[in-house]
């Protein structure tokens, strides 16, 4: 199977997000890379489902709370930018202060 670098990146993000999702479900606090992957994958999947950029920007702020992540992680993540594939093309989704 031949994959482009972009496709490989998407698979890596999805794998990290799956791990983060399982850890979150067990009550394990997420670290920085897991938090980024969790938010990014949710945005990417929402785009594929046909949600709008505005919907995803709002949803991105509701995914993680301070109690879901390790100490200091919310202060490290000021924004998450995702180039997501929507039914009508690729768009940049920016989520400001995603962990409340």
Curated annotation (Swiss-Prot):
<protein>
    <recommendedName>
        <fullName>Urease subunit gamma</fullName>
        <ecNumber>3.5.1.5</ecNumber>
    </recommendedName>
</protein>
<comment type="similarity">
    <text>Belongs to the urease gamma subunit family.</text>
</comment>
<dbReference type="InterPro" id="IPR050069">
    <property type="entry name" value="Urease_subunit"/>
</dbReference>
<dbReference type="GO" id="GO:0043419">
    <property type="term" value="P:urea catabolic process"/>
</dbReference>
<dbReference type="Pfam" id="PF00547">
    <property type="entry name" value="Urease_gamma"/>
</dbReference>
<dbReference type="InterPro" id="IPR036463">
    <property type="entry name" value="Urease_gamma_sf"/>
</dbReference>
<keyword id="KW-0378">Hydrolase</keyword>
<dbReference type="GO" id="GO:0005737">
    <property type="term" value="C:cytoplasm"/>
</dbReference>
<dbReference type="GO" id="GO:0009039">
    <property type="term" value="F:urease activity"/>
</dbReference>
<dbReference type="InterPro" id="IPR012010">
    <property type="entry name" value="Urease_gamma"/>
</dbReference>
<comment type="pathway">
    <text>Nitrogen metabolism; urea degradation; CO(2) and NH(3) from urea (urease route): step 1/1.</text>
</comment>
<keyword id="KW-0963">Cytoplasm</keyword>
<comment type="subunit">
    <text>Heterotrimer of UreA (gamma), UreB (beta) and UreC (alpha) subunits. Three heterotrimers associate to form the active enzyme.</text>
</comment>
<dbReference type="InterPro" id="IPR002026">
    <property type="entry name" value="Urease_gamma/gamma-beta_su"/>
</dbReference>
<dbReference type="GO" id="GO:0016151">
    <property type="term" value="F:nickel cation binding"/>
</dbReference>
